[in-house]
Regions:
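Juxtamembrane intracellular "pre-TM" segments in multi-pass secondary transporters
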Residues: 1-15, 191-229
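Intracellular juxtamembrane helix-capping segments at the cytosolic ends
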Residues: 39, 119-132, 322-335
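Cytoplasmic helix-loop-helix junction between adjacent transmembrane helices
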Residues: 113-148
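A late C-terminal transmembrane helix in Major Facilitator Superfamily
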Residues: 338-367
C-alpha cells in the first residue's frame, strides 16, 4: 500500500492546473523584480550617463530578439523541460556577471538575463496553453498578475536595500535562491507536453515560414502591436524612471521605494480583470492606454516640480496597470490550438522588439534632448495604442 500511496500522492500534488502556473509565474517574478531597480542603477554607475545605458540596452536587445526566434528550435531539440532549465542556468550566469562590477561583464550579464527570460517565458506560456482551458484564460491572466504583484511591489525596494545596506552581492545571491526555487518547483511538477496539441514528429518550426503566417492574421498582428506598445512603456519605466529619479537627487533606496510603490498597482489587476469581463477588455485597454499616456507626458511637462513629477510617475504606473489587467488575452483568445508553439514564439518577440526599439529610439532622443523627453515619446506611444485598441472585438 505504501509503495502505491506515495506515487499517487505525488501525482495529485503535482497535477498541473491554473493555480500551479500562478505559483510558477510568481516565483519567476521574484527573480526579475528584485533586479528591476538594481540593474539600471548599476548600469548608470558603470557607464556614466543615460545615453550610454541606452546604447548597451539596445545592443543587448538585438541578441534577445535573435534568441527568441531560435528558441523554438532549441525547445524541439531538447524538449521544454530542458529548455526551461537552460533558462535558469543562463540566469545564474547573469548574476555572476553582474556581481563582477565590470562594464563588459555587465553587458554580458544583461544579455544572459534577456535570453534567460525569453526561455522561461516561452516555455511557461506553452505549458499554460496546454493545460489551462481557453474558457479560463480571461480569469487566469488577472489572477496571475495579482499574485505577481507582491514580487513587483517589494522586489525593487528589496534589491536596492540589500545592495545599499549589506552589499550588491547579497542581492544577486537572493535572486539566485529564487532561481533555484523556481527550478526545484518546476521539476517537482513533472510537467509534460500535451499530446493533443503537440506533434513530436514534425520538424522544428522554421522562423522564415511562420513569421509571415503570424502577421497575415489581423487579430494576431494587432495583439502583437498592442503588447509591444505595453512592453515599450514598461521598458521605459523600468530603465528611465530610476535614472530620472536618481539624476533628480533621490537616493537609491528612495528610488527603489518609489518604483516599488508604483508597481503596487499590479494588485489592481484582479479588479481591472473583473471590470473587463463585465464591460469588455477593449474598454479596459483603451482607457488604460489613454490615461497612462496622458500622465506620462505630464511627467516631462511638470519636471520642474519634482514632487508633482514623482506623483505622476506613480500615477502613470497605476494607469498602466489597467493595460496589464488584460494581459495577453488578445493573443490567447486568437491563436489556433494547432499552431500554438509557432505563433507563441513569434508573439513573444514583442518583448524583445520593444527592448530593442525603446533604447534605440531613446539613445537618439537623448542625444538631442534631456532625459524627461523619453516620457513625452513614451506617452505619445501609449496614446497611439489607445487608438489602435478600438479595433479589438467588443466581446473580447
Amino acid at each position: 500500500m505504501r509503495r502505491t500511496f506515495v506515487p499517487l500522492w505525488l501525482n495529485s500534488a503535482s497535477k498541473p492546473h491554473a493555480g500551479t502556473f500562478i505559483v510558477l509565474f510568481a516565483i519567476e517574478a521574484w527573480s526579475r523584480a528584485t533586479l528591476i531597480t538594481v540593474v539600471p542603477l548599476q548600469a548608470l554607475n558603470l557607464l556614466g550617463d543615460a545615453q550610454a545605458v541606452s546604447v548597451v540596452y539596445f545592443s543587448v536587445s538585438i541578441i534577445g530578439l535573435i534568441s527568441t526566434m531560435v528558441i523554438p528550435i532549441v525547445v524541439y531539440r531538447i524538449k521544454r523541460r530542458w529548455a526551461f532549465s537552460l533558462g535558469g542556468l543562463l540566469m545564474i550566469a547573469a548574476l555572476w556577471a553582474y556581481s563582477a562590477g565590470d562594464p563588459v561583464l555587465f553587458a554580458i550579464g544583461l544579455a544572459c538575463q534577456v535570453v534567460a527570460t525569453a526561455f522561461l517565458e516561452i516555455v511557461m506560456n506553452l505549458f499554460v496553453l496546454d493545460h489551462v482551458p481557453r474558457s479560463e484564460i480571461t480569469k487566469f491572466e488577472p489572477r496571475r498578475l495579482f499574485f505577481v504583484a507582491a514580487p513587483f511591489t517589494f522586489g525593487p525596494w528589496l534589491g536596492v536595500w540589500l545592495a545599499e545596506t549589506i552589499s550588491p552581492q547579497t542581492t544577486f545571491i537572493l535572486v539566485g535562491v529564487f532561481v533555484a526555487a523556481l527550478m526545484v518547483f518546476f521539476w517537482f511538477l513533472r510537467l509534460t507536453e500535451n499530446p493533443a496539441v503537440t506533434m513530436p514528429l514534425k520538424p522544428p518550426p522554421n522562423p522564415v515560414r511562420f513569421l509571415p503566417r503570424f502577421f497575415i492574421q489581423p487579430r494576431l498582428r494587432l495583439a502583437w502591436v498592442l503588447a509591444a506598445g505595453r512592453s515599450s512603456w514598461w521598458m521605459m519605466f523600468f530603465v528611465y524612471a530610476p535614472l530620472y529619479l536618481s539624476t533628480s537627487g533621490y537616493s537609491p533606496q528612495v528610488t527603489g521605494m518609489i518604483i516599488s510603490l508604483s508597481l503596487g498597482s499590479l494588485f489592481m489587476a484582479g479588479v481591472w480583470g473583473s471590470i473587463g469581463r463585465k464591460y469588455g477588455m477593449r474598454f479596459i485597454l483603451v482607457s488604460g492606454y489613454a490615461l497612462a499616456g496622458g500622465l506620462t507626458i505630464m511627467i516631462a511637462v511638470l519636471q520642474d516640480w519634482p514632487v508633482i513629477a514623482v506623483s505622476l510617475v506613480v500615477a502613470s504606473a497605476f494607469a498602466a496597470s489597467l493595460v496589464d489587467g488584460a494581459g495577453n488575452i488578445p493573443f490567447l483568445r486568437s491563436v489556433h490550438p494547432y499552431e500554438r508553439a509557432e505563433m507563441t514564439s513569434v508573439f513573444v518577440t514583442y518583448r524583445h522588439t520593444a527592448q530593442l526599439a525603446t533604447p534605440g529610439i531613446f539613445s537618439v532622443v537623448l542625444g538631442v534632448f534631456a532625459l524627461p523627453a523619453v516620457f513625452v515619446v513614451g506617452g505619445t506611444c501609449f496614446l497611439g495604442m489607445a487608438w489602435l485598441s478600438r479595433y479589438l472585438p467588443k466581446k473580447l
